[in-house]
Amino acid sequence: MSALSPSPSLVVDRESWELAGHLLVDPPRGEAAEICPSLSHHLQQLLVLNRQAKDHPADPFPLAALLQLGLPLMDRRWTAQERESVRQAADQWRQELVGDTVSYVVNRNLNPSNHCVLRCGFCAYRRSEGEEGAFRLHRSELREKAAEAQALGATEVCLQAGLDPYATKNGSQLDHAVALLVDLKEAAPRLHVHGFSPQELLFLSQQDNLPLREVVQSLRQAGLGSVPGTAAEVLCTRVRQLICPEKLSARAWVAVIRQVHQAGLPTTSTLMAGHVETPREQLAHLCTLSALQRQAWLEGNTGFTEFILLPFVGASAPAPLRARVGRDQPDPEAMLLLTAQARLLLGPWIRHHQSSWVKLTLPVAAEALDWGCDDLGGTLMEEHISTMAGAAGGTHQSVVALEGAARGKHRPVRQRTTLYGAPAASC
């Protein structure tokens, strides 16, 4: 982005910017929990806290209690018995909150361009103009892909691209984005368009020097149905300075998401884990998401539709980061444990939890159904970002494969829409 681009605090509403500073949770300090017989007591207390929050959603957000109970849940030396206790507690809470049915969505990923002005330390997807492997799809190609997806029974198209400085119409980034949405809705009117991450929204706003509120409303009017909660990575300044110093700050991410929720657009929520972050930073991130969701509910908005744990894939990451992390693929045991921890810490605030077969592989994603997840994500039809990073899960899954994964866990399964409704019969 240009050095002359306005600061996020200048394009985001002042109220959202100030509130973001209060909603953003700092990692807790204090002594780390050692192996002790009290974990089961902490788990029971956490379940009680979650049930109380579910029954009394207007009560003050229990941040202090969440941090107090969450610290021994996150930062400890684990035994196999303790891991199993956490799994059982997460599975129990999942069943209480959303039942046993596993869901999935028939969708298609669309990546219009991998040109990007940022150079995040973990990204193998981005390219500069003229660089080998750079691509930019023509609008006609995107229309064709959307129409094909609708014809194949998809209910959703997911848009995600780099921050392409040349993606303009009449010199405007926003006009180009609006034209893209109009194209997609004309080509496939039944498809829900899920796109434009907080980073992309901020980029549009800064490049066109427009208030974020105007950008979001224009996109919504053009057909945008929901926003992916990507670019969150870990909502901690220390981590972001190490892996993505050019990206929007943690406070900016929170402020943008809050303003998107205010505009009536639901979003997903994410955590990219398994790299340089600590358990306490994971805990603070999850508490921030819960606080944001409670804020959305208080304001009468849907807020987050789901939480998606995104395990770090480093096979194609720069050598320094790969060396620091010490592995190229996710650690399944660590990610399953974090899946359960997230289910417990996100309490009643974020009901649906999705496992990522792209990053974990479908067998491990199915295993996550026993650790608190209730959703297997989408069919995708194609995928480039994680695959270019070296993910081993593949680029698409069939409905048969996703339903088979759920039934293999002896769970009922259903197709859903983006917002977890039932698809129309015509789709």
Name each model feature, range by range.
Residues 1-81, 150, 286-290, 294-427:
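Auxiliary Fe-S-binding modules of radical SAM enzymes
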Residues 67, 107-108, 130, 160-175, ...:
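Glycine-rich, proline-tolerant flexible connector loops at the mouths of alpha/beta enzymes
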Residues 86-127, 134-160, 227:
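N-terminal pre-triad scaffold of radical SAM enzymes
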Residues 102-110, 157, 193-197, 227-229, ...:
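Hydrophobic faces of well-ordered beta-strands that scaffold small-molecule active sites
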Residues 108-110, 163-165, 197-202, 231-233, ...:
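Active-site-proximal loop/turn and secondary-structure-junction residues that shape catalytic pockets
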Residues 146, 177-185, 216, 254-257, ...:
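Generic structural signal for well-ordered alpha-helices
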Residues 154-257, 261-268, 275, 295, ...:
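Conserved SAM/AdoMet-binding glycine-rich loop
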